[in-house]
């Protein structure tokens, strides 16, 4: 008995579509950051591609739901990190305070499942802010924009792949 199962046609399409969507997100954001900021946007490309992969789910409904959760978690991190970085230099202690505050906000919003998104975004923002203190306050703005682009490309990519595949097969779109 084999542990691995033979991939279906949809499994192959899904894999290629997700990879393509992630590469598109990465490319779009690296080019946008380079055009706007005048330097490589590797972190922006990375963050957009991660957001795309995060929302590329098994069904269109799950993909949209993941996109909403990702956006809420990122917005909470943005709302906490931006004013903090306007007023106080980035530090590990500050990151800890923001992580606790973000977790509490997500609990109050009854979005327990999205705490990890808020935490991951906060960690990335604060670590990059520590590495580049001169532009620290820009990090929440960049990560919010990267996330939105990644979500849009990921959800759209999933919906397009599902529509094309299931329409071609004459089956209900999932």
Q: Model-derived features: where do they sit?
A:
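Alpha-helical transmembrane segments and their membrane-interface boundaries
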Residues: 1-174
